Amino acid sequence: MRLDDLDVALLTALHDRPRAGDLELSRVTGVARGTVTARLRRMEDAGVVTGHGPEVDVGAAGFGVQAFVTLEIAQGALDDVHRDLAAIPGVLEAHATTGSGDVLCRVAAGSHEELQQTLLAIDRSSCVRRSTSVIALSCLVPWRTLPLLHSSVAERARRPR
């Protein structure tokens, strides 16, 4: 789905005011409430907007030790390792990747000892052939999407029609 200026304006307003309703968003963006409702529904249906729940800072919630784990897995074992990783609470996300590893995981724990237990649980998967981990010392750029969305709209505006 290609996002236009209004879509990005709505996403920016939602980012700045996560609890805003359609009426407030219509005031902020200067468009009719029905337009806001229709645009948000369209973005939800397309999978652009995936939820309205709170963003949780795992560090502030007591899980300040975070690491990235690269896994090399058995040939054809992606579905099995997906199942195994999904069962481990400390695995925040896992991505199939290209390069030297097959899967990249982000994990969190409350202490180094808990991190070790999470890493051991990952290694217990029969699909994992090798794992390497690095501990994150700090987050330099937190998860974000708005700069990418704004640059996309700006790039399209610069193109000749």
Q: Which role does the model predict for each range below?
A:
Residues 1-161:
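A compositional/biophysical signature of low hydrophobicity enriched in polar/charged and small residues
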